[in-house]
Amino acid sequence: MIGEKADICVVNTCSVTEMADKKCRQAIHRLVKQHPGAFVVVTGCYAQLKPGDVAQIKGVDVVLGAEQKSDLLRYLGNLQKHEEGEAFTTATKDIRSFSPSCSRGDRTRFFLKVQDGCDYFCSYCTIPFARGRSRNGTIASMVEQAGQAAAEGGKELRERDTNSIISSVSRFGSMEDIR
Protein backbone atom coordinates (compact mmCIF):
# COMPACT_ATOMS: atom_id res chain seq x y z
CA MET A 1 0.00 0.00 0.00
CA ILE A 2 1.18 3.50 -0.76
CA GLY A 3 2.45 5.26 2.33
CA GLU A 4 3.18 2.08 4.28
CA LYS A 5 6.70 1.29 5.42
CA ALA A 6 8.33 -1.72 3.80
CA ASP A 7 9.83 -4.55 5.84
CA ILE A 8 12.16 -5.56 2.99
CA CYS A 9 13.52 -3.45 0.12
CA VAL A 10 15.25 -5.04 -2.88
CA VAL A 11 17.20 -2.83 -5.27
CA ASN A 12 18.19 -4.38 -8.63
CA THR A 13 21.02 -2.18 -9.88
CA CYS A 14 22.68 -1.22 -13.16
CA SER A 15 26.32 -0.29 -13.70
CA VAL A 16 26.77 0.64 -17.33
CA THR A 17 28.34 4.02 -16.46
CA GLU A 18 29.55 5.95 -13.42
CA MET A 19 26.30 7.95 -13.70
CA ALA A 20 24.34 4.69 -13.38
CA ASP A 21 26.34 3.84 -10.24
CA LYS A 22 25.55 7.28 -8.81
CA LYS A 23 21.82 6.85 -9.52
CA CYS A 24 21.91 3.44 -7.83
CA ARG A 25 23.51 4.93 -4.71
CA GLN A 26 20.87 7.69 -4.69
CA ALA A 27 18.05 5.14 -5.01
CA ILE A 28 19.50 3.07 -2.16
CA HIS A 29 19.87 6.13 0.10
CA ARG A 30 16.30 7.20 -0.74
CA LEU A 31 14.86 3.76 0.11
CA VAL A 32 16.79 3.57 3.38
CA LYS A 33 15.46 7.00 4.33
CA GLN A 34 11.87 6.24 3.26
CA HIS A 35 11.80 2.84 5.00
CA PRO A 36 13.84 3.12 8.21
CA GLY A 37 14.50 -0.25 9.78
CA ALA A 38 13.70 -2.17 6.59
CA PHE A 39 15.98 -5.04 5.57
CA VAL A 40 17.75 -3.76 2.43
CA VAL A 41 19.07 -6.11 -0.27
CA VAL A 42 21.07 -4.76 -3.21
CA THR A 43 21.66 -6.96 -6.26
CA GLY A 44 22.40 -6.53 -9.96
CA CYS A 45 25.41 -5.34 -11.93
CA TYR A 46 26.53 -2.56 -9.57
CA ALA A 47 26.38 -5.00 -6.66
CA GLN A 48 28.43 -7.54 -8.63
CA LEU A 49 31.08 -5.06 -9.76
CA LYS A 50 31.49 -3.10 -6.51
CA PRO A 51 30.18 -5.27 -3.66
CA GLY A 52 32.44 -3.71 -1.02
CA ASP A 53 31.34 -0.18 -1.89
CA VAL A 54 27.67 -1.19 -1.84
CA ALA A 55 28.01 -3.08 1.46
CA GLN A 56 29.38 0.07 3.11
CA ILE A 57 26.32 2.17 2.23
CA LYS A 58 24.52 2.91 5.49
CA GLY A 59 21.36 0.80 5.76
CA VAL A 60 22.36 -1.93 3.27
CA ASP A 61 22.13 -5.38 4.85
CA VAL A 62 22.90 -7.83 2.05
CA VAL A 63 24.65 -7.45 -1.32
CA LEU A 64 24.01 -10.23 -3.84
CA GLY A 65 26.05 -10.71 -6.99
CA ALA A 66 24.88 -12.03 -10.36
CA GLU A 67 25.07 -15.70 -9.34
CA GLN A 68 23.24 -15.13 -6.04
CA LYS A 69 20.38 -12.99 -7.37
CA SER A 70 18.16 -15.97 -8.18
CA ASP A 71 18.61 -17.27 -4.59
CA LEU A 72 17.20 -14.10 -3.03
CA LEU A 73 14.73 -15.98 -0.81
CA ARG A 74 17.53 -18.04 0.73
CA TYR A 75 19.32 -14.87 1.81
CA LEU A 76 16.12 -13.45 3.27
CA GLY A 77 15.87 -16.39 5.65
CA ASN A 78 17.93 -14.61 8.31
CA LEU A 79 16.76 -11.00 8.42
CA GLN A 80 19.28 -9.69 10.92
CA LYS A 81 20.46 -6.11 10.63
CA HIS A 82 24.21 -5.52 10.87
CA GLU A 83 26.36 -2.42 11.18
CA GLU A 84 27.76 -3.11 7.70
CA GLY A 85 26.21 -5.07 4.86
CA GLU A 86 27.29 -8.60 4.00
CA ALA A 87 28.38 -9.18 0.41
CA PHE A 88 27.87 -12.49 -1.39
CA THR A 89 29.35 -12.59 -4.89
CA THR A 90 31.01 -15.03 -7.25
CA ALA A 91 33.96 -14.11 -9.45
CA THR A 92 32.53 -13.43 -12.92
CA LYS A 93 34.81 -16.08 -14.45
CA ASP A 94 33.00 -18.64 -12.25
CA ILE A 95 29.41 -17.59 -13.00
CA ARG A 96 27.68 -20.54 -14.66
CA SER A 97 23.97 -20.31 -13.87
CA PHE A 98 21.25 -19.05 -16.18
CA SER A 99 17.91 -17.93 -14.77
CA PRO A 100 15.22 -18.03 -17.46
CA SER A 101 12.74 -15.19 -17.62
CA CYS A 102 9.76 -14.28 -19.75
CA SER A 103 8.11 -11.08 -18.66
CA ARG A 104 5.07 -9.27 -19.89
CA GLY A 105 5.78 -5.73 -21.12
CA ASP A 106 2.23 -4.67 -21.80
CA ARG A 107 -0.98 -6.47 -22.68
CA THR A 108 0.36 -8.35 -25.70
CA ARG A 109 4.16 -7.93 -25.71
CA PHE A 110 6.45 -10.40 -23.93
CA PHE A 111 10.21 -10.22 -23.36
CA LEU A 112 12.03 -13.56 -23.42
CA LYS A 113 15.48 -13.74 -21.87
CA VAL A 114 17.47 -16.24 -23.90
CA GLN A 115 21.01 -15.26 -22.89
CA ASP A 116 22.84 -13.77 -19.95
CA GLY A 117 26.36 -12.42 -19.95
CA CYS A 118 28.41 -11.67 -23.04
CA ASP A 119 31.60 -12.89 -24.73
CA TYR A 120 32.29 -9.58 -26.50
CA PHE A 121 34.52 -7.37 -24.36
CA CYS A 122 33.64 -4.01 -25.90
CA SER A 123 35.66 -1.14 -24.44
CA TYR A 124 32.54 0.81 -23.43
CA CYS A 125 30.52 -2.02 -21.83
CA THR A 126 30.60 -3.63 -18.37
CA ILE A 127 28.29 -6.60 -19.06
CA PRO A 128 31.03 -9.27 -19.37
CA PHE A 129 32.55 -8.01 -16.11
CA ALA A 130 29.23 -7.79 -14.26
CA ARG A 131 27.38 -10.83 -15.63
CA GLY A 132 30.15 -13.11 -16.81
CA ARG A 133 30.50 -15.05 -20.04
CA SER A 134 27.59 -15.79 -22.34
CA ARG A 135 25.30 -18.60 -21.25
CA ASN A 136 21.72 -19.60 -21.93
CA GLY A 137 19.07 -22.12 -21.09
CA THR A 138 18.01 -24.97 -23.32
CA ILE A 139 16.20 -24.26 -26.57
CA ALA A 140 13.40 -26.53 -25.32
CA SER A 141 12.84 -24.40 -22.19
CA MET A 142 12.85 -21.17 -24.22
CA VAL A 143 10.42 -22.60 -26.75
CA GLU A 144 8.21 -23.70 -23.84
CA GLN A 145 8.25 -20.16 -22.40
CA ALA A 146 7.43 -18.69 -25.81
CA GLY A 147 4.53 -21.14 -26.11
CA GLN A 148 3.25 -20.09 -22.68
CA ALA A 149 3.43 -16.42 -23.74
CA ALA A 150 1.41 -17.24 -26.86
CA ALA A 151 -1.13 -19.18 -24.77
CA GLU A 152 -1.52 -16.14 -22.50
CA GLY A 153 -2.47 -13.99 -25.48
CA GLY A 154 0.96 -12.70 -26.46
CA LYS A 155 1.03 -11.18 -29.93
CA GLU A 156 4.63 -9.97 -29.87
CA LEU A 157 7.75 -11.62 -28.46
CA ARG A 158 11.02 -9.73 -28.04
CA GLU A 159 14.08 -11.79 -27.30
CA ARG A 160 16.76 -10.37 -25.03
CA ASP A 161 20.20 -11.55 -26.14
CA THR A 162 23.01 -10.92 -28.60
CA ASN A 163 22.33 -14.06 -30.62
CA SER A 164 19.06 -15.29 -32.09
CA ILE A 165 16.67 -18.21 -31.56
CA ILE A 166 13.85 -16.69 -33.59
CA SER A 167 13.63 -19.69 -35.93
CA SER A 168 12.97 -22.02 -32.99
CA VAL A 169 10.07 -20.00 -31.57
CA SER A 170 8.54 -18.74 -34.82
CA ARG A 171 6.41 -21.88 -35.13
CA PHE A 172 3.85 -20.33 -32.76
CA GLY A 173 1.48 -19.03 -35.41
CA SER A 174 -0.47 -16.93 -32.91
CA MET A 175 2.51 -14.61 -32.48
CA GLU A 176 2.21 -11.74 -34.95
CA ASP A 177 5.66 -10.28 -34.30
CA ILE A 178 8.82 -11.96 -33.02
CA ARG A 179 12.07 -9.97 -32.85
Residue ranges of predicted features:
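Alpha-helix-loop-beta-strand connector modules within alpha/beta enzyme cores
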Residues: 174-179
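Proteins enriched for Cys/Gly/acidic motifs involved in redox and nucleic-acid/cofactor modification
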Residues: 1-160
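Glycine-centered secondary-structure boundary/capping sites
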Residues: 82, 171-173
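Conserved radical SAM core fold
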Residues: 162-171
